[in-house]
């Protein structure tokens, strides 16, 4: 891949990680807490609670994947430019 392509992938991975960390995960944490609260009061079933928790874990995994990819793309840029610490 060219330096330009890797830089574009890095930008995308960083933006994805930031969106997940700053926007989607906080909203999902709020939703899980609300679902847990409703479940404790009998308004939601266990299936709804576990589904909310599963979705939260999926977002956490997506964040880890995006952050990992960002690091890998940074390493690739360093390799392509010969600029490593």
Q: What does each model-found stretch correspond to?
A:
Residues 83:
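Small/polar (Gly/Ser/Thr/Ala-rich) solvent-exposed segments
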Residues 1-62, 69-80:
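Amphipathic alpha-helical coiled-coil segments
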């Amino acid at each position: 891949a060219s330096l330009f392509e890797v830089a574009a992938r890095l930008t995308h991975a960083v933006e994805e990680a930031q969106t997940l960390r700053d926007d989607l995960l906080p909203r999902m944490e709020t939703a899980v807490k609300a679902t847990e609260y409703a479940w404790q009061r009998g308004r939601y079933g266990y299936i709804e609670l576990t589904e909310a928790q599963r979705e939260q874990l999926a977002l956490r995994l997506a964040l880890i994947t995006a952050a990992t990819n960002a690091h890998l793309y940074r390493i690739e840029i360093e390799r392509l430019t010969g600029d490593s610490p």
